[in-house]
């Protein structure tokens, strides 16, 4: 028996709403930290799920650190985050597997249209979890002839692009406000699990 848990997460929208919804359905608590500039509508949608929600005066990556620190200080506190770092990889891997379901559904829809293999796959990236899941799925689906993968980031939060440009296999971090109109992509630190996939399989 796990007892009463408190789920901690950082988000600027959909992920936090999902965590709050799941916590509510499971009879648990949720604490959601949103970065500076998050929309009031998204805040209210998360709050409607019963979560304790705050909009902080820091960027997304700092909100992730805040959520992790608070979880560590809370009895039965659990970080539910879709980005991974050293020592925190299991839950992000589960979330990426969930994202892979969308890739599977897309592949099935393509087959229904008699398109057996896409030539190119375009996917957006924040920390890279969704992108890593999509690239990983299609790479495994077509191991001998995978599509060309193109990942798009917000210009002000281009951590994956900078890592690719460096060419040494190491991830790069972008700091600051990460100001962009692309809600959900204002992330300056890549998921280490997805980085290992993307750096080996993405064309652009």
What label would you give each PLM region?
Residues 33, 56, 82, 152-154:
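Generic beta-sheet signal
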Residues 16-17, 132:
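Residues forming the Rossmann-fold NAD(P)(H) cofactor-binding site
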Residues 30, 53, 78-79, 149:
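Hydrophobic beta-strand scaffold residues
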Residues 73, 77-82, 93:
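Structural signature of the thiamine diphosphate
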Residues 5-6, 78, 120:
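Structural motif
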Residues 61, 66, 85-201:
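Glycine-rich phosphate/pyrophosphate-binding loop at beta-loop-alpha junctions
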Residues 13:
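Conserved catalytic/binding loops enriched for acidic/polar residues
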Residues 2-8, 17-72, 159-173, 194:
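Active-site-proximal loop->helix
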């Amino acid at each position: 028996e796990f007892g009463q848990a408190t789920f901690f997460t950082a988000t600027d929208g959909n992920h936090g709403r999902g965590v709050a919804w799941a916590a509510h359905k499971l009879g648990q608590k949720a604490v959601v930290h949103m970065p500076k500039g998050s929309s009031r509508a998204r805040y209210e949608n998360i709050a409607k799920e019963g979560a304790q929600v705050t909009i902080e005066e820091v960027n997304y990556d700092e909100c992730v650190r805040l959520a992790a620190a608070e979880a560590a200080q809370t009895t039965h506190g659990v970080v539910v985050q879709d980005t991974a770092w050293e020592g925190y990889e299991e839950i992000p891997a589960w979330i990426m597997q969930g994202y892979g379901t969308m890739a599977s559904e897309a592949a099935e829809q393509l087959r229904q249209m008699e398109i057996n293999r896409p030539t190119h796959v375009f996917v957006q990236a924040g920390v890279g979890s969704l992108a890593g899941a999509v690239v990983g799925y299609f790479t495994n689906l077509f191991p001998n002839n995978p599509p060309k993968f193109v990942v798009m980031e917000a210009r002000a939060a281009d951590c994956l692009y900078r890592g690719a440009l460096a060419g040494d296999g190491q991830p790069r971090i972008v700091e600051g406000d990460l100001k962009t109109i692309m809600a959900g992509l204002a992330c300056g630190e890549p998921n280490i699990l997805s980085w290992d996939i993307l750096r080996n399989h993405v064309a652009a």
